[in-house]
Amino acid sequence: MASEYEKMIAGDYYRPADPELRALAQASREKQEAFNQEVDPKKGAAIIKEWFGSTGENLYLNRQVLVDYGGNIHIGENFYANYNLTMLDVCPITIGKNAMIGPNCQFLTPLHPLDPDERNSGLEYGAPITIGDNFWAGGGVTILPGVTLGDNVVAGAGAVVTKSFGDNVVLAGNPARVIKEIPVKKEKR
């Protein structure tokens, strides 16, 4: 039988009050507290590398970083996040290389049942977020559960991304929609 953690990261119904999950969340809160009090960027990066599931080199995250578990977050090389990053990682959050995240951005994988009886039972579920390389999120962007974004995507300030999009697009609005395609540069000969 699958553990509540295994159910959670698979996107199945799980019980967030499970003792194992509570212990993992508490360990994450301790790392969160240490990171958010650290003023030395190198020491902060070391905490992130220990806390998150995987990271590339050259990462910089401003304070306040808020996450559920940390171990389900995977970020690539050259990752920058401005102030107040929230990553609720009940399912994996994967972001490719060369990402720039503006202030007050949220990556949210948790979902709750719509049926009130199911919701009141304490069950939750989630869906992963996957983002390709060269992502730029303006301030206040929210990425919702189950979203996949391709490479070279720009999400304009305040965008609420509720569905998946492919490569080379600029998104804006609530719900986010494509407002511009980014031309692909031709190879130089």
Please describe what each predicted stretch is:
Residues 65-75, 80-149, 174-189:
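Flexible, glycine/small-residue-enriched loop-and-beta-strand segment within the central core
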Residues 1-58, 175-189:
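Terminal amphipathic alpha-helical/low-complexity segments used for targeting or macromolecular assembly
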Residues 48-49, 64-66:
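Short, solvent-exposed loop/turn elements at beta->coil junctions and helix N-caps
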Residues 60, 136, 154, 170-172:
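Short-chain dehydrogenase/reductase
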Residues 151-164:
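C-terminal/domain-terminus segments
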Residues 5-6, 51, 121, 128, ...:
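Short secondary-structure boundary/capping segments
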